[in-house]
C-alpha cells in the first residue's frame, strides 16, 4: 500500500522580511513600541562595568579625580545618581554653650600654649607666670590689637564709605545732557596724533642749577620761600588766546585744563570745567576763586586724608601745602640773580605790563596747536618751568614738579629718609599708588608742552607735625614719554577722552556748559547751564586798561600763613 508523503508540511516557509530604507540618515526609520521611553546612554566596551550607578559622570563630587575614568563615552547623566537627604529624620539640636564649673575654667590653657611652642620668653612674646596664667608683652599687645578689626572691614560690617562734596552745587535749572562712566572712557582711543606745532612763545626762563642733582638724604637742603608772583590765568582771560582765536583753531584751552580732562579716569575728587560754545568754536575755562589749581595729596590712596578742617592734614590744607612746596621748589632749583643768564622767548610775559615792577616766577609759555581730525584744531597754552644747558649748547626745556611727604604713618607710605637713597623705586611706586592722578597730569602737561625732561623733587617736612618747614631730600628726572609708559599712561586714550568731550559739545547749540566729575562715583556729567551762570563771581574782578579782566594772581610766599 503506497502512502503519499506531504513534504510541504515538514519544512517551514520562508517569508521575506520588510527592510526599512532610511533615505535621510542611518538606522531604522521608526522605533518599536517596546523600546519607546527607554533612556539610552552611549557606552564603550572599555568602560568599567559592575557599578550600580555611573560615578564617572559629571555629577561626581570628587573634583580632584574627576577624569579618572573619563572617555569619549559615559558623559551622559541619564543614569546619574543624585543623593537626596531624607528630611523626615531632621530634628533640632540644642547648641547652647554649657557653662563650665569654676574649677574647670582655664584647665587646658597651659597645655595649648606649650603645644604651640610659645613657652616662657619665647619668640611669640607669651610669658607664663605660673598658676595657669599667660600674658602678652606690651609690645605684642599693640601689634595684636590692630589685627582685631581686620575681619570687620569686609562686607557690610565695615565703616560707611566716605562721602565727598561736589566741587560745585548742581542747580535746579541745569539740564543733564550726558553721563560718561570711566570704564567706557578708558576704552576710547585716538591714535596717530602728531606733536603739537608751535604758534608763538612768550616769557623768560632761568637755567637749572645742577647742584641740586647731588642732594640726598644725608645732604638735605632746606626749602626756601621764594617771593615771586605766579599767574594762573584761565583760557578766555589770556590775551594771546583771544588774539589767536580770530584766525587759528576752533577749540581753546590751557594745559592744566586739558590734563584734567585727559586724566579724568584716574581722579577721585570732584572737579568742574566750564565750556562755552560760540558758533563753531569751543572755549574751556576754569572757574575763578576755586581749588582747581591746588595740587591734591594722596587722592588715589586706599586711605585718603581725613576731612578735618582743623587739622593740618586735611585734604584742603595738604593741597595748599603741596602747591606752596611745588611753586617754591620749581623756583629754588634755578639759577637766580641779575648776573645769571636767562633764556628769553619771542614775546614777553603776556600777563604783566612794561611799567609793572614785580618779581615774576620763571615760566615760559608755549602756544601750540594740534589737529584732532574732523576739522578740529586745538590751540592750548603750555608751560615750561626751566631750561637746562647741554654740553652741545642746545637748550633742554624742563617741567619741574615736587612730591611732598607729610606723615608716612598717616599716609600709609614708606619712610623717605630710610628708603629714598637705597630704594628710590619703592618710594616712587608708593607715590604712583597714592598720587596716580597728580603724576599723570604732570606727565600730560610735560608731553603737551614738549618738555625734554620732567624733574621730580622729593620734599619732606622737617617734623611731621610742622607743616611750615620743609627740606629737599633728592631729585629725579625722566623723559616725559618714557615716564608715561612707565606709569601706564596711554596718550591715545587721553586724546580719545578729549575728543569725546569735544564731539559731545560740538553737537549742542551755542551756550554755556559744564563738565563735572561726580564726587562719589566714577562718572563725568555734562550739564547745560544758563549763560549767566557764574557771572556774578566775576563782577568784582579787576579789569585792565583794555577792558580784559584777569584772574587774581597768587603770591605763595606771602600766603605761607595759610598752611
UniProtKB/Swiss-Prot annotation:
One BP term from GO: formation of cytoplasmic translation initiation complex
GO cellular component, one term: nucleus
Transmembrane annotation, as ranges: none
RNA gate: annotated span: 291-305
Record's subcellular location: Cytoplasm
Keyword hit for Cytoplasm: yes
Domain of life: Eukaryota
InterPro entries registered for this protein in UniProt: eIF3d
Region (Disordered) location: 98-167
Modified residues (Phosphothreonine): 128
Keywords associated with the record: Cytoplasm, Initiation factor, Phosphoprotein, Protein biosynthesis, RNA-binding
Compositional bias ranges of the Basic residues kind: 100-121
GO molecular function terms attached to this record: mRNA cap binding; translation initiation factor activity
Quaternary structure, from the entry: Component of the eukaryotic translation initiation factor 3 (eIF-3) complex. The eIF-3 complex interacts with pix.
Family that this chain belongs to: Belongs to the eIF-3 subunit D family.
Free-text comment about domains: The RNA gate region regulates mRNA cap recognition to prevent promiscuous mRNA-binding before assembly of eif3d into the full eukaryotic translation initiation factor 3 (eIF-3) complex.
Function: mRNA cap-binding component of the eukaryotic translation initiation factor 3 (eIF-3) complex, which is involved in protein synthesis of a specialized repertoire of mRNAs and, together with other initiation factors, stimulates binding of mRNA and methionyl-tRNAi to the 40S ribosome. The eIF-3 complex specifically targets and initiates translation of a subset of mRNAs involved in cell proliferation. In the eIF-3 complex, eif3d specifically recognizes and binds the 7-methylguanosine cap of a subset of mRNAs.
Name of this protein: Eukaryotic translation initiation factor 3 subunit D-1
Native organism: Drosophila mojavensis
Amino acid at each position: 500500500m503506497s502512502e503519499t508523503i506531504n513534504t510541504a508540511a515538514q519544512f517551514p516557509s520562508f517569508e521575506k522580511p520588510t527592510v526599512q530604507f532610511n533615505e535621510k540618515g542611518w538606522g531604522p526609520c521608526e522605533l518599536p513600541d517596546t523600546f519607546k521611553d527607554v533612556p539610552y546612554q552611549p557606552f564603550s566596551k572599555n568602560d568599567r562595568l559592575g557599578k550600580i550607578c555611573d560615578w564617572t559622570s559629571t555629577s561626581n563630587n570628587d573634583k580632584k579625580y574627576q577624569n579618572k575614568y573619563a572617555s569619549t563615552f559615559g558623559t551622559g547623566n541619564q543614569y546619574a545618581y543624585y543623593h537626596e537627604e531624607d528630611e523626615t529624620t531632621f530634628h533640632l539640636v540644642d547648641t547652647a554653650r554649657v557653662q563650665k564649673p569654676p574649677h574647670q575654667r582655664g584647665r587646658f590653657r597651659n597645655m595649648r600654649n606649650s603645644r604651640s611652642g610659645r613657652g616662657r620668653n619665647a619668640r611669640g612674646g607669651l610669658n607664663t607666670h605660673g598658676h595657669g596664667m599667660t600674658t602678652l608683652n606690651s609690645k605684642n599687645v599693640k601689634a595684636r590689637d590692630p589685627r582685631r578689626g581686620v575681619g570687620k572691614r569686609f562686607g557690610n560690617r565695615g565703616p560707611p564709605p566716605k562721602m565727598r562734596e561736589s566741587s560745585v552745587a548742581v542747580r535746579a535749572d541745569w539740564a543733564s545732557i550726558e553721563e560718561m562712566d570711566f570704564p567706557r572712557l578708558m576704552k576710547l582711543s585716538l591714535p596717530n596724533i602728531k606733536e603739537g606745532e608751535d604758534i608763538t612763545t612768550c616769557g623768560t626762563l632761568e637755567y637749572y642749577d645742577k647742584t641740586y642733582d647731588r642732594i640726598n638724604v644725608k645732604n638735605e637742603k632746606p626749602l626756601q620761600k621764594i617771593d615771586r608772583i605766579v599767574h594762573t590765568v584761565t583760557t578766555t582771560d589770556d590775551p594771546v588766546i583771544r588774539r589767536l582765536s580770530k584766525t587759528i583753531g576752533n577749540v581753546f584751552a590751557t594745559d592744566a585744563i586739558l590734563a584734567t580732562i585727559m586724566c579724568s579716569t584716574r581722579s577721585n575728587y570732584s572737579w568742574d570745567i566750564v565750556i562755552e560754545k560760540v558758533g563753531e568754536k569751543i572755549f574751556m575755562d576754569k572757574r575763578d576763586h576755586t581749588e582747581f589749581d591746588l595740587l591734591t595729596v594722596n587722592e588715589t590712596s586706599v586711605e585718603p586724608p581725613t576731612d578735618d578742617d582743623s587739622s593740618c592734614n586735611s585734604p584742603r590744607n595738604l593741597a595748599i601745602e603741596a602747591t606752596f612746596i611745588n611753586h617754591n621748589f620749581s623756583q629754588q632749583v634755578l639759577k637766580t640773580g641779575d648776573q645769571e643768564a636767562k633764556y628769553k622767548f619771542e614775546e614777553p610775559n603776556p600777563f604783566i605790563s612794561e611799567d609793572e615792577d614785580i618779581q615774576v616766577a620763571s615760566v615760559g609759555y608755549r602756544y601750540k596747536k594740534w589737529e584732532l581730525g574732523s576739522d578740529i584744531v586745538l590751540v592750548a597754552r603750555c608751560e615750561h618751568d626751566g631750561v637746562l644747558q647741554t654740553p652741545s649748547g642746545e637748550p633742554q626745556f624742563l617741567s619741574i614738579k615736587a612730591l611732598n611727604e607729610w606723615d608716612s604713618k598717616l599716609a600709609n607710605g614708606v619712610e623717605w629718609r630710610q628708603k629714598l637713597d637705597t630704594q628710590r623705586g619703592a618710594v616712587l611706586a608708593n607715590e604712583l599708588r597714592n598720587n596716580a592722578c597728580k603724576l599723570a597730569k604732570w606727565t600730560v602737561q610735560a608731553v603737551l608742552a614738549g618738555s625734554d625732561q620732567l624733574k621730580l623733587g622729593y620734599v619732606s617736612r622737617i617734623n611731621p607735625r610742622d607743616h611750615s618747614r620743609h627740606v629737599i631730600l633728592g631729585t629725579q628726572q625722566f623723559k616725559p614719554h618714557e615716564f608715561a609708559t612707565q606709569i601706564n599712561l596711554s596718550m591715545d586714550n587721553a586724546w580719545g577722552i578729549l575728543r569725546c568731550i569735544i564731539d559731545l559739545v560740538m553737537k549742542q547749540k551755542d551756550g554755556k556748559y559744564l563738565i563735572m566729575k561726580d564726587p562719589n562715583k566714577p562718572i563725568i556729567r555734562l550739564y547745560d547751564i544758563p549763560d549767566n551762570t557764574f557771572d556774578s563771581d566775576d563782577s568784582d574782578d579787576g579789569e585792565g586798561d583794555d577792558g580784559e579782566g584777569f584772574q587774581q594772581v597768587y603770591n605763595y610766599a606771602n600766603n605761607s600763613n595759610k598752611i
